[in-house]
Amino acid sequence: MVTLADVPADERVIVDGTLVATGNRAGHDGLYSGKRHAAGVGIQVVCDTRGNLVEVAGPVPGATHDARAWFALGLHERLADRLVLGDLGYLGSSDDSTGCVVRTPVRKPPGGELSWGQRVSNYVHNAIRAVVERAIAQLKKWRVLSAGYRGPLSRVGEVIRTVVALEKLRTHPWPL
């Protein structure tokens, strides 16, 4: 199983957030994600450049923006002194105090267009980031995450950690 300690310090890691559907629950505010038009909890998925699942942080309420979850879950401290690739949801997430640098694609200026070089840079950036989308898709193959979690919200974090451990064992079985 690959952990953050196994990833060389000079290798970049890739981060992305996803929503685990839970349905709307009485007494739990902030679960509805306006971006995804669904209620659930958000998780932050970290993988290496080969697509190996390194870490999953969370859960946070589904309405929490990726950049806010990044800081709330302490990923900026755990990934200190590393180059991290993220999407536009992580704009402004670099942390000078820990040395964590989050590279994001170049954003199109209002009323303007990107130059050819910026478009190529974004293309390469997104091609590298595709592995984290694949890692999320592999996680979401587990029925408890794909069909929506229907158990008590107090245990959703435990269920997510269990699924992550099982997925790591599935992709990297222990040598016998």
Predicted regions and their residues:
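Short, well-ordered secondary-structure "scaffold" segments embedded in the functional core
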Residues: M1-L176
